[in-house]
Curated annotation (Swiss-Prot):
Top-level taxon of the source organism: Eukaryota
Source species: Pelophylax saharicus (Sahara frog)
Keywords, in A-Z order: Amidation, Amphibian defense peptide, Antibiotic, Antimicrobial, Cleavage on pair of basic residues, Cytolysis, Fungicide, Hemolysis, Immunity, Innate immunity, Membrane, Secreted, Signal, Target cell membrane, Target membrane
Protein name in the entry: Temporin-SHe
Stated role: Non-amphipathic mildly cationic alpha-helical antimicrobial peptide with potent activity against Gram-positive and Gram-negative bacteria, and some fungi, as well as against Trypanosoma and Leishmania (both promastigote and amastigote forms). Strongly and selectively perturbs anionic bilayer membranes by interacting with the polar head groups and acyl region of the phospholipids, with formation of regions of two coexisting phases, one phase rich in peptide and the other lipid-rich. Shows low hemolytic activity and a low toxicity for human monocytes THP-1 and THP-1-derived macrophages.
An example Gene Ontology biological process: innate immune response
Cleaved signal peptide residues: 1-22
Amino acid sequence: MFTLKKSLLLLFFLGTINLSLCEQERDAEEERRDGTDESDVEVEKRFLPALAGIAGLLGKIFGK
């Protein structure tokens, strides 16, 4: 009976550690996903003024 209790305690302990590691990994993935949204906004901010500049340049060229 003591051996059974010892084995169950060991399984519970290992399971708890496994769940903790999975939770940390999930949190890290969520942080990475949140970080990419911010970088997408930065890329968009850099891209739109360049696009507007090109459109203005083309308007001057073809407007003559």
